[in-house]
């Protein structure tokens, strides 16, 4: 009967939930640190205001948000945009925030290779997206149709990329 107690089941579910929550917190706090570099006052920095609002939406504690704004000048974080091709030529734009660009790019290249996707040269995917002014995200100019198996492969690829600590957002045209 090992592993069948109610507490073991609750503990297992809680571990999974806490891990996802922790990953979300670290990604949101990195976004705040990068946004606060321009101006640490959210009244004059709309990007920071947006990042703080999103963090509050995910119930990040106020202490953590304030600490991230204070630390914005300490660590040298930079934004990286990576372009890739997924199953059936679907286009991907991966945005990441990192303190070591080479490490992050190599780790993402490795994930792409292991999942059967291809790293693309800068600009080779971006042409098929538009940068929207509202939420500063990428919207595809056209949709790529995928069959069921390729759609499943793309979902697995996106999940693998989202597990990477430095990856902030992933945009696809599928």
Predicted ranges, named:
Residues 119-120, 126-174:
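Positively charged, low-complexity, intrinsically disordered RNA-binding extensions
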Residues 1-139, 174:
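N-terminal cationic and glycine-rich segments that engage phosphates or anionic surfaces
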């Amino acid at each position: 009967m090992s592993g069948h107690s109610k507490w073991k089941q609750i503990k297992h579910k809680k571990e999974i939930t806490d891990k996802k929550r922790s990953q979300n917190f670290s990604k949101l706090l990195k976004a705040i640190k990068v946004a606060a570099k321009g101006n640490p006052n959210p009244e004059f920095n709309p990007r920071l205001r947006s990042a703080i609002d999103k963090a509050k939406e995910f119930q990040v504690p106020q202490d953590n948000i304030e600490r991230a704004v204070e630390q914005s000048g300490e660590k040298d974080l930079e934004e990286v945009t990576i372009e890739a091709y997924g199953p059936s030529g679907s286009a991907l734009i991966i945005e990441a925030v990192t303190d070591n660009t080479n490490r992050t790019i190599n780790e993402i290249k490795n994930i792409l290779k292991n999942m059967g996707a291809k790293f693309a040269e800068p600009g080779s995917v971006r042409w098929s997206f538009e940068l929207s002014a509202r939420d500063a995200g990428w919207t595809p100019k056209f949709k790529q149709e995928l069959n069921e198996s390729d759609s499943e492969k793309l979902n697995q690829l996106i999940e693998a990329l989202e597990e990477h600590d430095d990856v902030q957002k992933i945009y696809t045209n599928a």
